[in-house]
């Protein structure tokens, strides 16, 4: 069904899960969640009734990867991002403009700033309006992702994931006024964070037969509660909704609860997978040490790997005196490794990706840059470049994570604009966890100058090396 990929052990049980109701599958990195999601999708699509099946994920690169390994001609199986689904559905009910339907983040910040300036003039003595605009952007985004539409809803709301931002209950009314004014000012009907709410509302009054009998969400931890609610509402009442997620990778999210997301698991058990089919025990041990950091946000649903299939060397951390020396070593190492294995270089942002790409090109290396239109494959001997976010769900034989220097990682701009430095550091640390757990064999990390405060330096599950001696 998936080329030479076959379900192993407990994974086979996912194929026999009921074709009705809600199912939640949680697993460690490397436990095969994406593989299980695809097996379930193909199994459902091949039922005698030939039901329509939708697989939804957040990451464009992962869409390309899933489509490639599925390699199926099943016309009743679709794989797409949430926002493609949302635009398509709203278009089907005549609610998606041909142009300027969705406001971009820059436009969102502009209109919120306009609303804030107007409020300052109208209520000059109100101290709430002296808070940074980033606090208002984040709070409005929280309201959108949780589908809050009235002041009463907001006043009653449990601010999941926002506890570190101190907003007194009596001051919530001022944030809601900015939210109202923002919605009144913008000319676009939606932004990227509230489009799920409008999809959900349209579905509530849509009496047409549902297009999809079964919907499967992969990398579900990246979805907001309203995204999940809207997808559940889009499923035929006699169909099924399946959620596959890794609670150790709550990067974008809302730290969503099952209740807030509309997932009914009272009558369904949560499936937990702790067998790691990707990472060697050495890398899993190092990844576990990342989760032991004081910066890590603890989660009661965390699944710790207990069994390991692969074998491999310890991860290695290499220190260089200068950035130039670090980059020179990276070029030579990648050149050698590319002849026999799949390799990915994971960087913090696109600017660093571009810098590394130029250096590689000058030295005769032509890397493939992973983005929403291009995935990476462990079976292809090649060199890939990716950001931390774009590499989610993918795997490679060798992973290189350069520039783990304190002035680069964590991202200083992210910290400066954060409403909660504690939360921002937790999210940055989870990026390192994601990157490290992409490896099927080798994990090479490097830095110049001072090592990042987020690196688990006290771990005994990695080796150190001095780049000047290599």
What are these regions (language model features)?
Residues 28-29, 151-158, 189-197:
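Short coil/turn segments at secondary-structure boundaries
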Residues 47-187:
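A basic/glycine-biased coupling hinge at the interface between accessory DNA-binding modules
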Residues 4, 9, 13, 23-54, ...:
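Conserved helicase motor core of SF1/SF2 NTP-dependent helicases
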